[in-house]
C-alpha cells in the first residue's frame, strides 16, 4: 500500500507540486482569502467591541492544512491586506485603526495560533479527532492569550475577560470541534484515494 499519506506532514504537502514555490504562494493567498470570507460572518455584540466571527475557525483550518510556516504566512498576508485598506477584517473593516484597535490583539494572535496549530499538524495531531481537538483548542487559547491582554489595555483586565473571553468560550469549543472533524475527515478521504489508486495499479 502507498505510504504517501503518512509521509506528508500536512494536507497541503500531500499532493504533488511540480512548481513548489508557486504552489506555496497560491496556498498562502488562498488561506488569506478564506480568512477574509469567514471574517464577513460577523455578529456584533452590544457589550463588547469584539464580534463573533468565523475567523478563528479559518485560523484553525488554515494552520492545520498548510502547516506552521505557510499558515503563519497566510495570516500575515491577511493582516497586511487589511492594514493596506482592503475590507478583509470583520464586517468589512480595514485599515491600521482596526489592526491596532481594541481587538487588534486577536488579529495578531491569528499568526501565532496558525503557526502553533500548523506545528502540531506537522506532527500528526490533525489525523484523529481526539488529537486534533487538542491542537485546535490550543490554537484558540493562543488567540485569546494575545487578544485579551491587548483588549485590557483599552478597557481594563476585568472588563476584557467579561467582554473578550468568557462569552466566546462556547463558540471556541464548537469551532475547535468543527475543525477537529473536518481535518481528520480530509485525511480519511486522502487515504481512501490512496487505496483506490493502489487497486487501480494492481
Place the predicted regions along the sequence by residue:
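Short helix-perturbing small/polar motifs within transmembrane alpha-helices
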Residues: 3-16, 23, 37, 96-143
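Alpha-helical membrane segments and adjacent membrane-interface helices in multi-pass membrane proteins
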Residues: 41-116
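Helix-loop junctions at the membrane-solvent interface of multi-pass transporters
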Residues: 37, 41, 65, 91-92, ...
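Hydrophobic alpha-helical transmembrane segments
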Residues: 25-30, 57-61, 72-77, 103, ...
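Helix-boundary and loop/linker segments of multi-pass membrane transporters
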Residues: 16-21, 49-50, 90-91, 96, ...
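Hydrophobic transmembrane alpha-helices
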Residues: 2-72
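Membrane-embedded alpha-helical hairpins and interfacial helices in multi-pass inner-membrane proteins
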Residues: 48, 120, 124-202
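Generic alpha-helical transmembrane segments of integral inner-membrane proteins
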Residues: 29, 33, 37, 61, ...
Amino acid at each position: 500500500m502507498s505510504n504517501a499519506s503518512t509521509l506528508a506532514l500536512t494536507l497541503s504537502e500531500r499532493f504533488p507540486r511540480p512548481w513548489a514555490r508557486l504552489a506555496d504562494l497560491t496556498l498562502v493567498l488562498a488561506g488569506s482569502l478564506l480568512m477574509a470570507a469567514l471574517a464577513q460572518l460577523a455578529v456584533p455584540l452590544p457589550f463588547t467591541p469584539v464580534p463573533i466571527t468565523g475567523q478563528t475557525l479559518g485560523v484553525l483550518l488554515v494552520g492545520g492544512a498548510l502547516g506552521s510556516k505557510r499558515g503563519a504566512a497566510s495570516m500575515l498576508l491577511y493582516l497586511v491586506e487589511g492594514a493596506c485598506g482592503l475590507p478583509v477584517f470583520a464586517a468589512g473593516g480595514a485599515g491600521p485603526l482596526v489592526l491596532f484597535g481594541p481587538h487588534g490583539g486577536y488579529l495578531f494572535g491569528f499568526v501565532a495560533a496558525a503557526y502553533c496549530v500548523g506545528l502540531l499538524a506537522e506532527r500528526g495531531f490533525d489525523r484523529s479527532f481526539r488529537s486534533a481537538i487538542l491542537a485546535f483548542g490550543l490554537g484558540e487559547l493562543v488567540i485569546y492569550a494575545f487578544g485579551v491582554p491587548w483588549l485590557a489595555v483599552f478597557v481594563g483586565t476585568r472588563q476584557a475577560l467579561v467582554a473578550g473571553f468568557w462569552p466566546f468560550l462556547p463558540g471556541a469549543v464548537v469551532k475547535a470541534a468543527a475543525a477537529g472533524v473536518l481535518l481528520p475527515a480530509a485525511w480519511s478521504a486522502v487515504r481512501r484515494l490512496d487505496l483506490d489508486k493502489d487497486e487501480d495499479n494492481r
